[in-house]
Amino acid sequence: MANVVVVGAQWGDEGKGKIVDWLSERADVIARFQGGHNAGHTLVIGNQVFKLSLLPSGIVRKGKMAVIGNGVVLDPWSLFAEIDKLSAQGVEISPANLMIAENTPLILPLHQDLDKLREEAAGASKIGTTGRGIGPAYEDKVGRRTIRVADLGDEETLDSRLDRLLAHHDALRQGLGAAPIDRAELRAKLLEIAPKLLQYAQPVWKVMNDYRKAGKRILFEGAQGSLLDIDFGTYPYVTSSTTMSGMAASGTGLGPSAIGFVLGIVKAYTTRVGEGPFPTELDDADGQRLGERGHEFGTVTGRKRRCGWFDAVLVRQTCAISGVDGIALTKLDVLDGFQTLKICTGYEVDGQHYDHLPTAASLQAKAKPVYEEMEGWQESTQGARSWADLPANAIKYVRRIEELIQCPVALLSTSPERDDTILVTDPFAD
């Protein structure tokens, strides 16, 4: 059986949580490999709704091992709050079903402070971060001054790390008009949580390789979306990690050959949270309708999402970069009742045609979508579980998307319920 990597192929919020949950029933191990608690998943299982932002989606299923890899930045206090919330909903979480890489960097309160201070100082030029310290935590990782999970096990090491970290942050805070960090208070907080966090710590790279050798089925769960990738996203309006499929290997300690099937999650229209270019954005009644019908509010921030028509150019681009083998098309039911649907097939920039999104921010800002119109459908697709349940025009819409993005549909989702899914290609099959 192939291991499967799940990545968002747009700006996030594509419905990865449901798809990962649907796939996790057949996986043995579900691993997060990048990001932090800045992206949320909403899972609907029976009559229960679970909202996750850091824990892998598979944590809600019994008999699965949930893994937080070294590519993640971990806020321990948010982790414990999420564990407590799920425990109150009847989910059992212990070292028997949750493992955290020893070399995972920690998000500390000072990272969140810096995130907010910078956004306030930027004013109208702000990036639109969630303010949860993700970016500053990754900066410290690359700057070789981060505190990692394993550092909590030795006070001498922790003190050395704190000295280096605070020398940097106090200088930044002074420039932003903020008071120095209370070292004693931060140290006490870290020592307080150390035993609780260290119980989950493991050499994830070794355990994952052992799982692979034993033939365990591994599901790699990406966060955010490919268009928020630090290298290939709409820079600088991006996240601070690599969101493409290749990160599944380096973010857990498995080699690239461990990746079998890459599944890109794609919404049947387009949404975005925060600032940045969005060529197909709709500021009219159609955009309002998409937002209302799709319940487009962020799981983590509660912010209203910007909505627009499906952008085949962007999805083709991200599928190529991540090596997507098949997509899971979600929220098709949101398009029920539209008389006419539009798909972006290219851009016009200063009279020149583009079949991809240009890298230069100045060109991205001027990109005008070139649309292809398709006839909509009035019948309901909600809850469809086979092609026979879909209106003819809905099938035409799906097939046209496949042609334009040059990638087949492997799964089709027609409601938040996990079983309302049409399987075309089994991602776990060799």
Swiss-Prot record:
Residue numbers binding Mg(2+): D13, G40
Residues that coordinate or bind IMP: D13, E14, G15, K16, N38, A39, G40, H41, T130, R144, Q224, T239, R303
Keywords, in A-Z order: Cytoplasm, GTP-binding, Ligase, Magnesium, Metal-binding, Nucleotide-binding, Purine biosynthesis
Catalysis: reaction(s): IMP + L-aspartate + GTP = N(6)-(1,2-dicarboxyethyl)-AMP + GDP + phosphate + 2 H(+)
Main localization (coarse): cytoplasm
Gene Ontology cellular-component terms listed: cytoplasm
PROSITE patterns: ADENYLOSUCCIN_SYN_1, ADENYLOSUCCIN_SYN_2
Enzyme class: ligase
InterPro entries in the cross-refs: Adenylosuccin_syn_GTP-bd, Adenylosuccin_syn_Lys_AS, Adenylosuccinate_synth_dom1, Adenylosuccinate_synth_dom2, Adenylosuccinate_synth_dom3, Adenylosuccinate_synthetase, P-loop_NTPase
Enzyme Commission identifier(s): 6.3.4.4
Pfam families reported in the protein's UniProt record: Adenylsucc_synt
Top-rank taxon: Bacteria
UniProt xrefs under SUPFAM superfamilies: P-loop containing nucleoside triphosphate hydrolases (SSF52540)
GO biological process: 'de novo' AMP biosynthetic process; IMP metabolic process
Matches recorded under HAMAP family: Adenylosucc_synth
Xref: NCBIfam families: PRK01117.1, purA
Protein name according to UniProt: Adenylosuccinate synthetase
Organism of this sequence: Paracoccus denitrificans (strain Pd 1222)
Taxonomic classification: Bacteria, Pseudomonadati, Pseudomonadota, Alphaproteobacteria, Rhodobacterales
